[in-house]
Amino acid sequence: MARSLTWGCCPWCLTEEEKTAARIDQEINKILLEQKKQERGELKLLLLGPGESGKSTFIKQMRIIHGAGYSEEDRRAFRLLVYQNIFVSMQAMIEAMDRLQIPFSRPDSKQHASLVMTQDPYKVSSFEKPYAVAMQYLWRDAGIRACYERRREFHLLDSAVYYLSHLERIAEDDYIPTAQDVLRSRMPTTGINEYCFSVQKTKLRIVDAGGQKSERKKWIHCFENVIALIYLASLSEYDQCLEENSQENRMKESLALFSTILELPWFKSTSVILFLNKTDILEDKIHTSHLASYFPSFQGPRRDAEAAKRFILDMYARVYASCAEPHDGGRKGSRARRLFAHFTCATDTHSVRSVFKDVRDSVLARYLDEINLL
């Protein structure tokens, strides 16, 4: 009969083979214990929201605030993306001018526009002087400016006015993107992206899922072991339509997505952090685009950004409350989650640092206290 091994017995009672097996067993247990410690010490947050709500910008801010930031070499790598964003923006306005029947105001604008349209934005390798001169000329054209004011009628990157206002600097031969240039750069998120960093000795892993509808089916495997959900929504999209569907209002789609996510079983007891983003764009846009034109239930004054922000927050709060209500008339005791809402400007590092500190002090501290990690 083969004897059973008891590793607690005296070492000299074991054969060499048993000693080797015991050593391997101890090493495996040590590795498993270390993995458990790492898993216990790492907290995962899921970052969700519709496309262009600012999720990637938020991740970049976390890298600047809590990570290594962006070295000169890192920033240099964004140069072609900045050029691409500029060409995409100017070409979008040139095409929209024709569709909206807005004429150019300057004599040589058509010639400059034709030159800009010859470049494939996704094959840009440099920002050659003729293109830079053409864009600077066009950006001073009153027709282009009038088209920009009607940007809600076509798809235009939020960063367009920022980059076009800095063309002279960006067109320099030795151009290296600044941290702000990097934050403003836009590349659609596809698939799942993760970023890890530490806050007060706590390891955080933020999982960023693609915001476009075609990407949402890939989120499912990210839902497990999430301590909090961060949902980003744009305040400025109330008068815009989806890039994928020109008939669907972006804010209504975001509210519907928020509701869908809250109803998922994975989030029944997960705290929800709501970032209502792009306060700066809302404050600029509200002067020319009345919120009530798109959401008739808004009865606040025109051109009042604070009233608009409160109304939009209330819409999201009502969605949250409706998803938290029991469907059978009883209590949903299993739902111990809470909603933490913040207004943000993801391109403002100081603002994001302050907001994330509030998140850390509320949501993360609450969770760590519950599992006795504090």
Curated annotation (Swiss-Prot):
G proteins are composed of 3 units; alpha, beta and gamma. The alpha chain contains the guanine nucleotide binding site. GTP binds at residues 49-56, 183-189, 208-212, 277-280, 346. It comes from the Eukaryota. Residues 41-374 form the G-alpha domain. CDD domains: G-alpha (cd00066). Residues 273-280 are annotated as: G4 motif. This is Guanine nucleotide-binding protein subunit alpha-15. The gene is Gna15. InterPro entries: Gprotein_alpha_Q, Gprotein_alpha_su, GproteinA_insert, P-loop_NTPase. Keywords: GTP-binding, Magnesium, Metal-binding, Nucleotide-binding, Transducer. GO terms for biological process: action potential; adenylate cyclase-modulating G protein-coupled receptor signaling pathway; calcium-mediated signaling; phospholipase C-activating dopamine receptor signaling pathway; phospholipase C-activating G protein-coupled receptor signaling pathway. Residues 204-213 are annotated as: G3 motif. Residues 44-57 are annotated as: G1 motif. Mg(2+) binds at S56, T189. Residues 181-189 are annotated as: G2 motif.
